[in-house]
Regions:
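Serine-hydrolase catalytic core recognition
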Residues: 5-194
Length: 194
């Protein structure tokens, strides 16, 4: 069984499935699976790394504690390719923080977007943390924002900024925040509250 994020498309008979699998280091494999024993019948596609010939940003993932002091939050740092930890870099926090979305994933490049890669190539540190209220961590994790928008998830993002300020290469005087949709709400709220 391949490690990574799997998305299955089941055949009408239920006997076979197409398995789209991706991991931090594998862009995409597409396999035909026999459902009864989960055996790979055929690999239909094994996508090569499209960035293999390029000097790409480094992606680091890890955990910080939420504002409640006990919940582990997943984060992703996208770092300039030639990061020098003795220098200070401007940093952008990309935030969503709302329901039904997970930004730090176990698939290709841990879910880093083209924007993250682009900005890191230009000398920015890019940071994302999935605060409480985001998807795929269970009901209790997701429901802390129910009828309580802009409180717990904001406090978690502030914990993320505190973590960033502890890193030797982050310029604490040049940290920006960016988001769209619920992330736009979070961005505005963070700017006006903190």
């Amino acid at each position: 069984w391949k490690v990574g994020v799997h998305r299955w498309l089941l055949s009408p008979s239920g006997e076979y499935a197409i398995d789209y699998v991706s991991s931090p280091s594998t862009p995409r494999d597409i396999d035909l699976i026999r459902v009864k024993d989960a055996k790979v019948i055929s690999t239909l596609l094994s996508a090569p790394d499209p960035f293999k010939l390029y000097r790409m940003p480094r992606i680091k993932v890890g955990h910080i504690l939420a504002a409640d002091g006990k919940t582990r939050l997943n984060y992703r740092l996208t770092l300039p390719p030639d990061l020098d930890e003795t220098k200070k870099y401007p940093t952008i926090v990309y935030v969503y923080g709302g329901p039904k979305v997970q930004l730090v994933t176990g698939d290709w490049q841990n879910g880093a977007r083209g924007w993250d890669l682009y900005m890191a190539q230009r000398g920015y540190v890019m940071f994302t943390v999935d605060s409480r209220g985001s998807a795929n961590r269970g009901h209790a994790f997701e429901s802390v924002i129910h009828r309580n928008l802009g409180i717990n998830e904001m406090a978690d993002q502030v914990k993320g900024v505190e973590f960033l300020k502890s890193l030797s290469y982050v310029d604490a005087d040049r940290i920006g925040v960016h988001g769209w949709s619920y992330g736009g709400f979070m961005t505005t709220n963070l700017m006006l509250t903190y």
